Amino acid sequence: MDFSGKNVWVTGAGKGIGYATALAFVEAGAKVTGFDQAFTQEQYPFATEVMDVADAAQVAQVCQRLLAETERLDALVNAAGILRMGATDQLSKEDWQQTFAVNVGGAFNLFQQTMNQFRRQRGGAIVTVASDAAHTPRIGMSAYGASKAALKSLALSVGLELAGSGVRCNVVSPGSTDTDMQRTLWVSDDAEEQRIRGFGEQFKLGIPLGKIARPQEIANTILFLASDLASHITLQDIVVDGGSTLGA
């Protein structure tokens, strides 16, 4: 896939899937701007903007400045997200609200600042990263799953609103992926193997392909959906989970 000369924005680009996606776009020739609350490396092969996606005023300020400096935004990837674990009746109000503020509100803020640009240029692609937790309930993940389900609905609604302008909007829903977020759930030396086998007591199936996804595998799907190879694909949600949701 060739993104030479394309202008691409990726949120959550400091680490994990967002970082892998930003790198993949750079390797494909794109001019990439990555957004995150913090960037811990001294150097990155793409432009970086420190920004809290949950802060609407900050998002507006940064996006308006960047859009004034460019003629076209070819692709937007909403990959910023957080995970707060806890049973529904034990989860703090703060954790619930913060999860929605970042996972749903963050994308909403980016949509609000970029939709007019996409309409004016009559083209482009948006890929939003949800989760297989939006498809299958998980014990202790009510906030995360609910936020990702809301995010999916939001992204597809935006896709319908922009379709008449030739803008494609799709969703990628990863399963367990080898990121810092995933590793916070691993509390034993064999946690990865346990996840692959599944947790019957939690009604959580294993992974038929027998492995945890690599961030690059999620990034590959994102790049495909943003590319001309997917020129007639919009309003779709591709689950990349090694089969763990059994197509649910």
Curated annotation (Swiss-Prot):
- Quick check: keyword NAD in the entry? yes
Against CDD domains, the record matches this protein to: DH-DHB-DH_SDR_c
Q: What class of enzyme is it?
A: oxidoreductase
Q: Name one GO biological process term.
A: enterobactin biosynthetic process
- Residues where NAD(+) binds: 9-33
**Cellular component aspect of the GO annotation:** cytosol; protein-containing complex
Q: Work out whether the entry's keyword set contains Mitochondrion.
A: no
Pathway terms, separated by semicolons: Siderophore biosynthesis; enterobactin biosynthesis
What induces or represses expression of this protein, per its UniProt record? Answer: Under conditions of iron deficiency and by the fur protein.
Known activity regulation?
Answer: Inhibited by cis-2-hydroxy-3-cyclohexen-1-carboxylate, cis-2-hydroxycyclohexane-1-carboxylate and trans-2-hydroxycyclohexane-1-carboxylate.
Q: Which UniProt keywords apply?
A: Enterobactin biosynthesis, NAD, Oxidoreductase
Family statement drawn from the similarity comment of this UniProt entry: Belongs to the short-chain dehydrogenases/reductases (SDR) family.
Outline the subunit composition: Homotetramer; dimer of dimers. EntA and EntE interact together.
The protein's name in its UniProt record? 2,3-dihydro-2,3-dihydroxybenzoate dehydrogenase
Q: Which organism is it from?
A: Escherichia coli (strain K12)
Q: Which gene encodes it?
A: entA
